[in-house]
């Protein structure tokens, strides 16, 4: 009798365990646990890009043949009073792109054409990039980009162009690198997310508008500024020279230059002087976005 009772108890416990296991599997299928974002771990002995004396074998932790990282920003303003276009916040430059130049200032473009994309919104809106476990959700990132990454032919047209032309040339964002440290989405989607996330991070850290305004330089219509004064204000804030772009005698953009320690996902950016000269000379106008 005792043996029968023990056997029945054993069967009951086994059945309960199976039922609980099945219920748990159904639960995690319907409500998947967010995967944690795995940042890559690269050797501390890897040199900065463009500073290595020998070839670096770990191509997921060393950006090559690029390695001179440029963060380019627009200052778009109408020639006359505000047009229908949205130029972004009045007190902020907007993003042009994040570029991966070679150490000599030349660059590759439209790499890995088979991985080109047609939509950024569709990818960043996917459930896999909005479940949590990420530094910022894909949809929140899109909201930031819609404010600070403006294109004159539509924002998404610019985003797609920048990723296909420059993002796909960042070799430390290759799919095989994500196989090494994991991702919360497909490797291809994760790379797209990371390109735009890192570009936004850099933009939010480096504020050219306030670097100038702290030196008493603000957009105005009635008088030009000395280009050297503006250049010095930007350099004081960044710690290195900053490349300024002008169209005629109007300021239209700035570009910050960096070297990189570790892969692009490390975000270990090291400011350096530009390899290209500024195109702004003499007296230049910084036009308000509201127009003149």
Curated annotation (Swiss-Prot):
Active site: residue positions: 96, 162, 166
Gene Ontology terms describing biological process: apoptotic process; cell morphogenesis; mRNA catabolic process; RNA catabolic process
Top-rank lineage group of the source organism: Eukaryota
Reactions listed under catalytic activity: a ribonucleotidyl-ribonucleotide-RNA + H2O = a 3'-end 3'-phospho-ribonucleotide-RNA + a 5'-end dephospho-ribonucleoside-RNA + H(+)
Broadest EC class assigned to this enzyme: lyase
Subcellular location: Vacuole lumen; Cytoplasm
EC number(s) reported in the record: 4.6.1.19
GO molecular function list: ribonuclease T2 activity; RNA binding; RNA endonuclease activity
Disulfide bonds: 42-61, 50-103, 60-177, 111-169, 246-280
Function, in words: Rnase which modulates cell survival under stress conditions. Released from the vacuole to the cytoplasm during stress to promote tRNA and rRNA cleavage and to activate separately a downstream pathway that promotes cell death. Involved in cell size, vacuolar morphology and growth at high temperatures and high salt concentration.
The protein's name: Ribonuclease T2-like
Source organism of the structure: Eremothecium gossypii (strain ATCC 10895 / CBS 109.51 / FGSC 9923 / NRRL Y-1056) (Yeast)
Gene this chain is encoded by: RNY1
